[in-house]
Design a protein with these regions (language model features):
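Amphipathic alpha-helical dimerization/coiled-coil segments
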Residues: 2, 78-95
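A cross-family signal for key residues in well-ordered alpha-helices
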Residues: 17-20, 51, 82, 89
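Residues within the DNA-recognition helix of helix-turn-helix
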Residues: 46
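Beta-hairpin "wing" of winged helix-turn-helix
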Residues: 51-67
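Basic, amphipathic "hinge/linker" alpha-helix immediately C-terminal to the N-terminal HTH DNA-binding motif
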Residues: 62-83
Length: 95
Protein backbone atom coordinates (compact mmCIF):
# COMPACT_ATOMS: atom_id res chain seq x y z
CA UNK A 1 0.00 0.00 0.00
CA UNK A 2 1.25 3.48 -0.90
CA UNK A 3 0.03 6.86 0.31
CA UNK A 4 -1.99 7.33 -2.89
CA UNK A 5 -3.63 3.92 -2.37
CA UNK A 6 -5.15 4.62 1.06
CA UNK A 7 -8.73 3.35 1.05
CA UNK A 8 -11.52 5.80 1.80
CA UNK A 9 -12.27 3.78 4.94
CA UNK A 10 -9.13 5.20 6.55
CA UNK A 11 -9.88 8.82 5.66
CA UNK A 12 -12.44 9.27 8.44
CA UNK A 13 -11.60 9.55 12.13
CA UNK A 14 -14.76 7.68 13.13
CA UNK A 15 -14.22 4.81 10.68
CA UNK A 16 -10.62 4.50 11.89
CA UNK A 17 -11.85 4.38 15.49
CA UNK A 18 -14.38 1.67 14.61
CA UNK A 19 -11.80 -0.50 12.84
CA UNK A 20 -9.26 0.05 15.63
CA UNK A 21 -11.80 -1.08 18.21
CA UNK A 22 -12.80 -4.14 16.18
CA UNK A 23 -9.27 -5.37 15.49
CA UNK A 24 -9.24 -6.94 18.98
CA UNK A 25 -12.62 -8.64 18.47
CA UNK A 26 -16.29 -8.08 17.75
CA UNK A 27 -18.20 -5.38 19.58
CA UNK A 28 -21.85 -4.55 20.07
CA UNK A 29 -23.25 -1.35 18.62
CA UNK A 30 -23.61 -0.06 22.17
CA UNK A 31 -19.93 -0.79 22.92
CA UNK A 32 -18.80 0.97 19.74
CA UNK A 33 -21.00 3.93 20.56
CA UNK A 34 -19.35 4.18 23.99
CA UNK A 35 -15.83 3.81 22.58
CA UNK A 36 -16.28 6.32 19.75
CA UNK A 37 -18.69 8.70 21.51
CA UNK A 38 -20.52 8.98 18.17
CA UNK A 39 -24.23 9.53 17.75
CA UNK A 40 -26.41 6.55 16.82
CA UNK A 41 -27.02 7.96 13.35
CA UNK A 42 -23.41 8.77 12.52
CA UNK A 43 -22.15 5.45 13.87
CA UNK A 44 -24.78 3.56 11.89
CA UNK A 45 -23.89 5.37 8.65
CA UNK A 46 -20.17 4.66 9.05
CA UNK A 47 -20.74 1.00 9.92
CA UNK A 48 -22.93 0.67 6.82
CA UNK A 49 -20.16 2.15 4.65
CA UNK A 50 -17.59 -0.22 6.14
CA UNK A 51 -19.98 -3.12 5.55
CA UNK A 52 -20.55 -2.10 1.91
CA UNK A 53 -16.76 -2.09 1.37
CA UNK A 54 -16.49 -5.55 2.94
CA UNK A 55 -14.49 -4.35 5.96
CA UNK A 56 -17.04 -5.39 8.61
CA UNK A 57 -20.06 -7.64 9.05
CA UNK A 58 -23.06 -7.08 11.26
CA UNK A 59 -25.10 -9.74 13.00
CA UNK A 60 -28.45 -8.97 14.57
CA UNK A 61 -29.81 -11.15 17.35
CA UNK A 62 -31.90 -11.01 20.49
CA UNK A 63 -30.41 -11.25 23.98
CA UNK A 64 -33.03 -11.56 26.73
CA UNK A 65 -35.66 -10.41 24.22
CA UNK A 66 -33.69 -7.26 23.43
CA UNK A 67 -32.25 -6.66 19.95
CA UNK A 68 -28.48 -6.54 19.73
CA UNK A 69 -26.21 -5.80 16.79
CA UNK A 70 -22.70 -7.24 16.84
CA UNK A 71 -20.09 -5.83 14.46
CA UNK A 72 -17.02 -7.84 13.45
CA UNK A 73 -14.07 -6.93 11.28
CA UNK A 74 -13.69 -9.17 8.22
CA UNK A 75 -10.51 -10.79 6.95
CA UNK A 76 -10.37 -8.10 4.25
CA UNK A 77 -10.81 -5.40 6.89
CA UNK A 78 -8.08 -6.90 9.06
CA UNK A 79 -5.63 -7.13 6.15
CA UNK A 80 -6.36 -3.59 5.00
CA UNK A 81 -6.08 -2.23 8.55
CA UNK A 82 -2.72 -3.95 9.11
CA UNK A 83 -1.43 -2.66 5.76
CA UNK A 84 -2.53 0.84 6.74
CA UNK A 85 -0.68 0.59 10.07
CA UNK A 86 2.44 -0.68 8.28
CA UNK A 87 2.24 2.27 5.89
CA UNK A 88 1.97 4.71 8.79
CA UNK A 89 4.99 3.09 10.46
CA UNK A 90 6.94 3.36 7.20
CA UNK A 91 6.05 7.03 6.81
CA UNK A 92 7.08 7.74 10.39
CA UNK A 93 10.34 5.84 9.98
CA UNK A 94 11.16 7.81 6.82
CA UNK A 95 10.76 11.19 8.54
Amino acid sequence: MELNDIHEAFQSKLRLMILSALISGGKSFKELKSITEATDGNLSVQITKLEEWGFVTTTKSFILKKPQTIINITEKGTIQFKEYVLLLNKVLADT
